[in-house]
Amino acid sequence: MSPAATESGRDLSVGVEEEFFLVDESGHLSAAGPDVVTEAGHDIHGLQRELARCQIETATGVCHTGEELHEELRSLRRRLAKAAAGRDLLLLPSGTSLVVEGLPPAITPSPRYEEMARHFGSIVDTVTTCGCHVHVGIPSRDVGVRVSNLVRSWLPVLLALAANSPFHSGHDTAYHSWRHIMWSRWPSAGPPPHFDSADEYEATVGAMIGTGAAMDRGMIYWHVRLADKQPTIEVRIADVAMTAAHAALYAVVVKGLVGWALQSLDDGLTVPWLRAELLRAQLWRAARDGLDGECTSPAADRVLPIRRQLELLNDCVAPGLGPSDRAFLESGLDTVLREGTGAERQRAEFTRVGTLAAVVDLLTREVVS
């Protein structure tokens, strides 16, 4: 996936990577991920193994509209679910696993993954989560760093919108995104610093690798980072979405934010930015409270409810999107506010039925919608 960079938000290309759990009908993790990748990889472009054997990652090609992205995401999910069904397994679209497991997830055999397990020890046993990563084309790395400085302020709102992991290991965590809390255990994870230049970005990456906090550039787990293999900026804050429609909506929001940032740079607009420690604190709040929380608004420079900030976010990103994407964004946000985020839908199903098995059933049905 290598979305090409262009100059306006409506023309920006976008691609999405999604991680999924493989589970049996009871919701327990399956170690068959590498086998499913081997069997289905020739039919499903972009299928990849992950750190844990219970996970699989998909990647779209280059897309330009929300509708195009939705169709490709839905097709990838359906084909992968069919491949999993060939082994009597299900695709679980949740940021965290739901039921109690007896042992930590098994690591996929590979020299890199085995070295990660040795280097980071028990952290590796406790960070098995599934996320959604959105790539948007940018003109250059210098511009990408400046875009990151603007986009980072919106990370709490993005996290609240994308939250889909309220349950883990058999209980309600009291968070909307427990995945965010788990993932934060990596020493290289968190909001990106505010950088003055691409040179400063590269120096910081080198220093983190030098300390051992990251083994290599692929382990720079900032929530916004510059991709190394394609000319894109990558936003990594989201839980994997319950539905393809929600994943596509989130990707359009990210695309629109990058377009807004590029236009803001052209216009000389400055946006107040939070220090990393304050942004980290606001991300914790967003992970806990979801859309019911509040944080400092980049658009208003004061604390506002996140639901109100969704309106401000829409005001920022919509002008840079084409007509079809504006309609896709408006419809998608209306649906989320009416039906709930993934986390809200998971909790509602548990409240209605009273079992995590019912939540697993909901997730494995909705994954292909």
Curated annotation (Swiss-Prot):
Pfam families referenced in this protein's UniProt entry, alphabetically: GCS2
EC number(s) recorded for this UniProt protein: 6.3.2.2
Name of the top EC class for this enzyme: ligase
Gene Ontology MF term list: ATP binding; glutamate-cysteine ligase activity
Biological processes per GO annotation: modified amino acid biosynthetic process
Gene3D superfamilies: 3.30.590.20
Task performed by this protein: ATP-dependent carboxylate-amine ligase which exhibits weak glutamate--cysteine ligase activity.
Protein name (Swiss-Prot/TrEMBL): Putative glutamate--cysteine ligase 2-1
Species assigned in the record: Rhodococcus jostii (strain RHA1)
